[in-house]
């Protein structure tokens, strides 16, 4: 099997204003080579809270465009990583993952416990879904992100994952403790339970694939067959740069986040 080239984004914890907070990288697995294409060092990054605006996160593609999410802005790049455009919305805050289906790009708006939809043809945010809970029942409320009647900033469930395909929309967060599915009538159901603090949970191959971040493993849980857990690599302390820096915004080793299915 030929090894792929992948595009990855990074978040650099502990950076100070004016320093690099991450970037976009082209990773050639066959040649064992990494090339940085974009350096994220903007000076207007929000420094409140752990991580927050820092770095670049979700990635999606259209035929001739590369879409990358920052905390409160969606960027469009050419295949040669030239900036084409950027798009903001007052209800987009602390975005993590994005997912495309046809001409719609779905984004997690973590700060608002919401999912937003961006129309790739019209180049505007056209739809929003706010998640809350009434007792044990999940509640989804639609809103128009172009108006003023949207939700308040809450971040109760820390929605950090959305996946859209022919089977529908699934999403989850650090504090949902379940993979959630959105039905056509806007009802929300639980697909399965999830460990607290996981990332990137998605249906896959009749089961669920996720970063079980608290356990430092990538985990596949089958409905009927065997389950698999693969440890996230841990490197010798002596090989690490800036080791010993004690800051609550520094990510620890083995912290698994980000999944790309290639076959």
Where do the model's predicted regions map?
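Conserved beta-strand positions in repeat-built beta-propeller and related beta-rich domains
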Residues: 8-19, 28, 67-71, 107-112, ...
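Surface-exposed loop and turn segments in beta-propeller and other repeat-based domains
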Residues: 34-52, 88-91, 125-155, 228-252
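Beta-rich catalytic cores
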Residues: 20, 55, 94, 111, ...
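Blade-loop segments of beta-propeller domains
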Residues: 36-99
